[in-house]
């Protein structure tokens, strides 16, 4: 399926002004071009990623322009293979293949990767984390966690889940004794290893590219005002910020998001680690100031690991899927009228984003109930 989509994308792009290739892929490739001639990837406007992504895509500058699309598609498949390995430890191999197909054969996932979006790299890193944790390779898992946070900020929250997962039963009579009894050597490995890798990656990139690296890779994302292709309920606020220079409080937008991402692992992290990461990521994306289609990949990668013996396979799960699709369709209709037809539909677009948000909050409740 991915090979067909990759070839279709090449054919389509040659014949249509509306490209199959994601505009972000052109940004990645342009940044890689600057790296190939010894310049900073941040010479390319709107490149807001670690330089490592541009370095990974260097083959695009040497006769293989579709290299990144193949890399992301292969990453998808490797993530699927790791899912099968993880699921096979709990259920039969045949059932593992069935559940992993929700990722491997998912057209949404395949299209996102073959269009040239880099989220598949985060997918393989996320599944590799779980795989290594289950294999008791905690040091290696901690290094991958540190690299993941360097690559994109959001995996930092998985560290909270891992700390809870590796905590020991409470002992002692005083608060301090109970607190100290929770600590374990694996928690220390997670903290030390991830901080070490995160620091090394950042120091290296800062040495090579200086303050623009920090500004565009990290600082930009705390105050970003992207309003195009944004499913978030903050869409209209961000539009006014970007158009009129108004400034809403970013802190208030982050508070519910960060609170949920900390509370969910505290409640569920010990008993269901894959489910905790799924719920954490779903909550993070739902409450994020910017929410685009590729962000759904962040939590969909955990779905096959959560489905076995889950309430999501019941009627409630079907309702969740229906609401998830309907919410996106309603938003996309308004977005098409705005961006392609030039109609003034800001209020309907905001209302459809608000409805999608409420749908996702209901879905989050069902997910938490199933853990």
From Swiss-Prot:
The keyword Signal does not apply. It is found in: Endoplasmic reticulum membrane. GO terms for molecular function: glycolipid 1,4-alpha-mannosyltransferase activity; mannosyltransferase activity; NADPH binding. Its EC number is 2.4.1.-. Pathway: Glycolipid biosynthesis; glycosylphosphatidylinositol-anchor biosynthesis. Belongs to the PIGM family. Pfam families: Mannosyl_trans (PF05007). This is GPI mannosyltransferase 1. The chain crosses the membrane at residues 64-84, 120-140, 144-164, 190-210, 248-268, 290-310, 318-338, 344-364. Keywords: Cell wall biogenesis/degradation, Endoplasmic reticulum, Glycosyltransferase, GPI-anchor biosynthesis, Membrane, Transferase, Transmembrane, Transmembrane helix. It comes from Schizosaccharomyces pombe (strain 972 / ATCC 24843). GO terms for cellular component: endoplasmic reticulum; endoplasmic reticulum membrane; glycosylphosphatidylinositol-mannosyltransferase I complex. Coiled coil: none annotated. Mannosyltransferase involved in glycosylphosphatidylinositol-anchor biosynthesis. Transfers the first alpha-1,4-mannose to GlcN-acyl-PI during GPI precursor assembly. Required for cell wall integrity. GO terms for biological process: cell wall organization; GPI anchor biosynthetic process. It is a multi-pass membrane protein. InterPro entries: PIG-M.
């Amino acid at each position: 399926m991915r090979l067909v989509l990759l070839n279709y994308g090449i054919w389509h792009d040659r014949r249509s002004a509306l490209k199959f290739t994601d505009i972000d892929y052109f940004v990645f490739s342009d940044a890689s071009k600057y790296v190939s001639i010894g310049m900073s990837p941040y010479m390319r406007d709107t490149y807001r990623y670690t330089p490592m992504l541009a370095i990974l895509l260097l083959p695009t500058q040497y006769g293989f322009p579709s290299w990144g699309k193949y890399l992301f598609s292969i990453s998808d498949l490797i993530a699927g293979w790791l899912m099968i390995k993880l699921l096979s430890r709990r259920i039969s191999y045949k059932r593992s293949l069935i559940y992993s197909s929700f990722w491997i054969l998912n057209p949404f996932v395949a299209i996102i990767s073959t269009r040239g979006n880099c989220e598949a790299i985060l997918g393989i890193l996320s599944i590799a984390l779980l795989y290594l944790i289950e294999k008791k390779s905690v040091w290696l898992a901690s290094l991958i966690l540190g690299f993941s946070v360097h690559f994109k900020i959001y995996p930092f929250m998985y560290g909270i889940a891992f700390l809870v997962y590796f905590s020991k039963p409470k002992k002692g009579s005083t608060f301090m004794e109970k607190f100290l009894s929770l600590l374990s050597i694996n928690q220390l490995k997670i903290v030390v290893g991830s901080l070490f890798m995160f620091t090394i990656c950042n120091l290296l990139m800062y040495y090579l590219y200086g303050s623009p690296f920090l500004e565009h890779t990290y600082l930009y994302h705390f105050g970003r005002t992207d309003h195009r292709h944004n499913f978030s309920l903050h869409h209209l606020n961000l539009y006014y910020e970007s158009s009129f220079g108004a400034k809403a409080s970013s802190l208030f937008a982050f508070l519910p998001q960060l609170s949920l991402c900390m509370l969910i692992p505290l409640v569920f992290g010990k008993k269901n680690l894959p489910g905790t990461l799924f719920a954490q990521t779903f909550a993070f994306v739902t409450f994020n100031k910017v929410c685009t289609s590729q962000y759904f990949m962040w939590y969909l990668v955990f779905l096959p690991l959560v489905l076995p013996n889950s309430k999501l396979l019941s009627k409630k799960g079907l309702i969740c899927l229906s609401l998830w699709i309907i919410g996106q369709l309603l938003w996309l209709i308004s977005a098409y009228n705005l961006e392609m037809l030039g109609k003034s539909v800001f209020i309907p677009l905001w209302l459809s984003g608000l409805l999608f948000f409420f749908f996702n909050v209901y879905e989050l409740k069902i997910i938490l109930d199933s853990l």
